[in-house]
Every structure is written in structure tokens, then in C-alpha cells.
UniProtKB/Swiss-Prot annotation:
Pathway: Organic acid metabolism; glycolate biosynthesis; glycolate from 2-phosphoglycolate: step 1/1. It comes from Cereibacter sphaeroides (strain ATCC 17023 / DSM 158 / JCM 6121 / CCUG 31486 / LMG 2827 / NBRC 12203 / NCIMB 8253 / ATH 2.4.1.). It comes from the Bacteria. Its cofactor is Mg(2+). Belongs to the HAD-like hydrolase superfamily. CbbY/CbbZ/Gph/YieH family. Mg(2+) binds at residues 7, 9, 167. CDD domains: HAD_PGPase (cd07512). This is Phosphoglycolate phosphatase. GO terms for molecular function: metal ion binding; phosphoglycolate phosphatase activity. Specifically catalyzes the dephosphorylation of 2-phosphoglycolate. Is involved in the dissimilation of the intracellular 2-phosphoglycolate formed during the DNA repair of 3'-phosphoglycolate ends, a major class of DNA lesions induced by oxidative stress. GO terms for cellular component: cytosol. The active site is at 7 (nucleophile).
Amino acid sequence: MPGVVFDLDGTLVHSAPDIHAAVNKALAEEGGAPFTLAEITGFIGNGVPVLIQRVLAARGEAPDAHRQAELQGRFMAHYEADPATLTSVYPGAEAAIRHLRAEGWRIGLCTNKPVGASRQILSLFGLLELFDAIIGGDSLPQRKPDPAPLRATAAALNEEVVLYVGDSEVDAATAEAAGLRFALFTEGYRHAPVHELPHHGLFSHHDELQDLLRRLLA
């Protein structure tokens, strides 16, 4: 059977609340004002370095490599210490992946989240064993929307990957750059209207994924 690759944040798990909590914990240590969940959710998608850049820019701070590294380090310390208390798996996601595996599909994960934190979250939810390959935001020099991470995930699966499943503009651009079909989960962290994202199929609940795959492969 061929392979399918998933994004993580906003596609398989609703992780924004824990990311939000870790950012605010890091800022509270220096007396900084907290961000709202909506604000932090809007910063998610391009990996931790860009998340922190956006936090600093929103605070009106000029770009500074030392400041970036310092806040990023404290954010990661908080996030890795408590990555999943407020996180949830989207309804039907685990069942959909287990069904695909039962049919013989190879399953990959391509995310801009650091690979260690990704594995930690998957393990906490009992999902780690379901993935044959995992590429994170620190696995390669490039991050999505560069196609290199998605291509590396496909190569690690050692199967023809027919679909990338994600929720955002970054994911859509990554699939397009890699020359793969893209299935858009509409309930994640995208900013633009659905019609503005290039996609070959879309779904709002993971229960719909098997039928979508059948239609795309017909």
C-alpha cells in the first residue's frame, strides 16, 4: 500500500492551549503581559523560532538573536515539561490512522514542531507506535513550507506517498512545492478562507478521511 503523511498541530491534535500556556509562563518570568489564546494560535504554523519571533514582534521588540534564543529556550523548557495537559486529539483522528494502518498504509508525520516534543505528545496519547516515520522542525536545516521535510518523510516511509494531510497555508504550500496532493482539515489553524488554499480534497472530521482517500485514489 502507498503512504500518507500527516501534519500534527491543528491536524491531529489541538495543541494551541499548551503552546499558549508555555509562552505566557516564559513571559511571566520576566513580568511580561500575557497573550490571549487567539493571539498565540495566530502565531502557530512555522515552527518554534518563528513563533517566538512573532511573540517578540507583537511586543514591539526589535529583532535580537540573543533575546530570541533566551526566550525560545525558556519557552521550550516550559513546553517540554508540560506539553499535553491542555492538548486534545481531534475526534476520530486516532481511529482514522488505525484504520489506515489496518489496511496496510504506511503513515508518516511531517511537522514544524521539534521532533522531541512531537514524539513526546504522540507517546502521551498512545499514538507514537502508529507512525513509521517522523520528521520535525529541527530534523533538517529546512522547515515547511520548504518541501525538503515532506520529501524526507516520504523517503523514510520507503513507499509512494500519495497524500499530505494538513490544516494550514503552510501545509498547502508544502504539499504543492513537493508535488503531492493535499487534503485540508478545515477545523485547524488556517488563517485564510478555504477557497484560497490549494487542495485536492477537504474534510471537517476525521471520520471522513477514508472516504476522501478513496475518492482521490479512484
